[in-house]
Amino acid sequence: MNTFKKAVAGSLFLAVTLASQAHAEDASCATVTLGDPGWSDIAVTNGIASLVLDGLGYDVKTQTLGVPIIFAGLQKGQVDVFLGNWMPAQQANYDKFVASGAVDKVAENLSGTEYTLAVPTYAYDAGVKSFADLNKYADKFGHKIYGIASGAPANESIKEIIAANEFGLKDWKLVESSEQAMLVQVGRAVKRDEFVVFLGWTPHPMNVQYDMKYLKGGEKYFGDSGSVNTLARKGYAAQCPNVGKLLSNLKFTQDMENAIMDQVLSKQASNDQAVKDWLKANPEVIDNWLKGVTTREGGDALAAVKAKL
């Protein structure tokens, strides 16, 4: 082989080697474990991630856990990815695990969120426009605030408000339950035109299902307009660069999540089917998610994922 041929052969070998290394991942990357706190919006985003990862040739496991346990799982390497780091609601957990360097922030996946106490519009129109107004109507509310599952950061904020007698709420009680049970209580109260105060957030179909308003004055505990981050166990994106690239690309919109959640909560489709139907109707979003991403074996990611739809 002459010098020129050797040079060409060497260049080709190097190119193939580098391409292989670019997509090479540790064997442990074959299975991706997602944390799920049991919320409708994260069921949607986990469903999207699962469908895409499955198309790329990865196995996906979902662990349904409380938020504090998900953070601890990320720190211990028992959970790979969490798509539901709502900020600033989870600021304390973020500071403890992410800001300290124990868990990695990969990207912001959603912006413009709202997360605070809410009331039906008829209660708002009657004078309950802020946290400071709640205790004026304590009897109508039954001295109760309806929250979500125990351990949720928002519940802890409500407990802090009550313990500190903020807004005169020391005699109030937080009722903890699942998201679904909370919304059943809200629906029951709305049918009877009764006062009810509960934890509300966007995106969520509750904003369409109920004529509701968010209360002002709780910014100290719930912050202003927020965002949602994608987190991963420390070093995960470097260890599993192909998955890491996908995670950094995954961006959602409120309209997207609301549309899918509405299909699920109105029982028109399962979560997996609603995700698939929405992506079939909006395939252009997949193009951006898969930029710089391949299948696990280094193949055409776009073709593989669209074949799953």
Give short role names for the model-derived ranges.
Residues 23-33, 53-54, 136-142, 287-289, ...:
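Immediate post-signal peptide segment of exported/extracytoplasmic ligand-binding proteins
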Residues 49-56, 138-172, 280:
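Ligand-binding cleft/hinge of the Venus flytrap
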Residues 102-151:
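A conserved helix-loop-strand patch within extracytoplasmic ligand-binding domains
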Residues 46, 63-101, 181-185, 204-211:
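Pocket-flanking alpha-helical
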Residues 26-41, 58-63, 142-146, 247:
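Short, well-ordered beta-strand elements
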Residues 79-83, 153-220:
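Ligand-binding pocket segment of bilobal, Venus flytrap-like solute-binding proteins
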Residues 1-23:
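Gram-negative bacterial Sec-dependent N-terminal signal peptides
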Residues 114-124, 226-239, 263:
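A bilobed periplasmic-binding-protein/Venus flytrap-type ligand-binding module shared by bacterial periplasmic
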